[in-house]
Amino acid sequence: VEGEVYAFSSLFTAVVFWLILKWEDVADQPHSDRWIILIAYLTGLSIGVHLLNLLCLPAIVLVYYYKKTPNATAKGSLIALLGSMVLVAAVLYGIVPGIVKVGGWFELLFVNGLGMSFNSGVVVYIILLAAALIWGVYESYTEKNKARMAISFILTIALLGIPFYGHGASSIIIGILVIAALGLYLAPSVQAKIKERWRITARTMNTALLCTMMIVIGYSSYALIVIRSTANTPMDQNSPEDIFTLGEYLGREQYGTRPLFYGPAFSSKVALDVKDGYCIPRQSEAGSKFVRKEKTSPDEKDSYIELPGRVEYEYAQNMFFPRMYSSSHAPLYKQWVDIKGHDVPYDQCGEMVMVNMPNQWENIKFFFSYQLNFMYWRYFMWNFAGRQNDIQGSGEIEHGNWITGIPFIDNLLVGNQDLLPQDLKNNKGHNVFYCLPLILGLIGLFWQAYHSQRGIQQFWVVFFLFFMTGIAIVLYLNQTPAQPRERDYAYAGSFYAFAIWVGMGVAGIIRMLREYCKMQELPA
């Protein structure tokens, strides 16, 4: 799995970042936007491999901002970063689920409403979406009528489902409000009154629509999943043979959810309510789902039936930034952190009992000791300091740690390595770099950051590539102890970024030697 998915995903990460640098070299030329459009196409393709490639977008947006803004400021950089986050959200929470959502509405209309066969609504939706994209590109290219240009753009955004965030009626209300606000902003009369820097030009709209079209074309690779499932192959997990089951497949609903910003701890108890004299757990439903109705006769028309969506329990005790949330991993959490906790009252249907909850400091300690240190920095140091062996560890001093090859440092970290048995000493995964790549990377990092105004801009580009493909993934995954395998493959993009600093370190050393030692450049 790792070789098939993450190697391909790493390729997309490298190519997309290289392409934005190619664009930077020719940004002032007439047809430079084609590099941006190619990036959009590869981003759409990469969605069919893994969503990790979307994490390159903040770095890409910074490159774009610094190139287009000679006198860039910290405020402008922050706005560009916020814009990049909106862009990631528009793809991740807009286009990816939105196409399925709006396609599902068309499917229900044509199958349940008009009595047509399965997938007829999806076919009509795809045709309309393609027509809207082509119309929008044409109108923004010709610039014959600004009103039609705005209408075609808004129609495309609506058909993509980007404004319809959430579930049920609330998503429709949000979508209508967003579309209304966008329509007001793009109205020709409003565009004529606002400052020029905030106007949406035809070129910007055309490029945005072309990029959207390329993302959709790349994203359409998921059609293979539906075609394969329709053939009823022996391996057909979730059977995504229609737009609704495809939505569950894309949402990875079989894996459940993990709390990120606010949620329960491992010792939290389900909130209870008394109803008709019975004590029942409090639950919430995440919308509803539609499944194909089994026919009782061949003459019966195709139709979908509505079923309750995913049901989740609500907990009485919650905390911010919950890192220790899994009740099935409670003993393992206690191996990583000495949890004293604190007692909080819990209403057990009229009976008050005390529940011991980990405090916020213990929660943060687990985040730093396990999730950040063991599940990220350990892998980072494997690549730039050294690796003890390739035996998966769970915190033991003899399995899978990072080392340097420098005895007095390794003795402090994991003990005397000379005392290990021969099978561990001679492990083929054993490798030491004496921290030389790490030192070069740190030199490159500081040299780039303090070299010049151009250098600090380049530093922030590389930093956000490093952060978003590394630590940001750690924050999002919220991993539990005792993972089934080592997860170093997920952070390859972050190691790419630090490798750039390693190369910068070599350049920095040469520059420093040239400056301080008056070293002359040798002839080629």
Which residues does each predicted region cover?
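Transmembrane alpha-helix segments characteristic
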Residues: A150-L159, C211-I217, F433-L440, Q453-Y476
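Membrane-interface transmembrane helices that cradle and orient dolichyl/undecaprenyl
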Residues: V16-W35, L62-T73, I134-K144, P188
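Hydrophobic/aromatic-rich transmembrane helices and adjacent perimembrane loops
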Residues: I176-L177, Q483-G508
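Transmembrane-embedded, aromatic-rich helix segments that form part
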Residues: S10-F12, L52-Y64, P97-V100, I174-V178, ...
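Hydrophobic, aromatic-rich transmembrane alpha-helices
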Residues: L128-Y141, L186-S189, K193, Y434-R454, ...
